[in-house]
Amino acid sequence: MTDTKIIPIDSEHNAIFQCLSGEKGTEDVKSITITASGGPFINAPIQDLQHVTVEDALKHPNWKMGSKVTIDSATLVNKCLELIEARYLFDLDEKYFDLVIHPQSIIHSIVTYIDGSSIWQMSSPDMRVPIAHALSEVNRIPIEFKDLDFSNLNLSFQEFPSDRSKIQDIAREVCN
């Protein structure tokens, strides 16, 4: 075993890492919530998805990402891959992880502890934020970013769509 430390860069995993920072480990974790914007089709009936084009799928409402990740986001595949990654990265059984839709992409992950408290990591949907944290870890470095306007901030959450749960079931099976 080495003293090597893995510092995640992906926004959700970096958020979990930050929420766990200062804790003695994961033994007091009750659950971890990983958020998903849901992509451009989250409110579209599943039967309508057979008519979407690649161009439609590449129009992510919040994030600027490469084509593959944007398509994976539109299909919710990326969230399932993130579930698998989080399970192994944080060495917790998949049952600890919940996936929820958060269309605004402001809350990146939530760690809830056994005492009922929750720590949320939030920032504008900008990959420079988790990358800067990963590069500096202990000493935060200044970057240009869009401030959150808390007086006009609306946060909403919804359950992972049941008509799209098959992909999540597969991801959970892979974790076991």
Task: Please state what every model-predicted region is.
Residues 1-176:
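Catalytic, metal-anchored helix/loop core of enzyme active sites in primary metabolism
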